[in-house]
Amino acid sequence: MTMRRFAGERLVGAQLTPGDKNKVVHAFDVDDTLTMKPDGFDNTGLTKDQFFDAAREFPADPAVVELAQMLASKGDRIAIATARPAARLEETMDWLNKNNIPYDQIMLSNGLEPSGVAKQEMLQRLQDDYKMVGTLFDDSPYNIEGAKMQGIDA
């Protein structure tokens, strides 16, 4: 499998399989969607870098992982759409692989715009590359509302 890296105005990422206008893609956020904070974890006072350093060890949410695996097994594509900064691409891919989370594409924010703006660009990119974006799985009400405004279930 060949990985193609890309960089846009508000995002960076990697595409493991090409877009396909005959396929549905589902987008998953990482933090607080695919990951679960350990009981008692408090990120109050942590910098973003400290939070992302700690997140390397967060467990995956088994129910969300199972959902992603089920969607992939029926032939749908999986995209990871996260506001994590671009510098966290490799470690995020490592975490996804370690937790057996399937993905065809991964997109991260370049940090120059608010995360919600970057997430909207990610969803637009997916709409351009696939038949449709089936669902956005995300913990942010702002991102969920933005997806609905684009006609995407969330």
Model-derived features: where do they sit?
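Residues at the starts of beta-strands that form the adenosine-phosphate
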Residues: 77, 133, 153
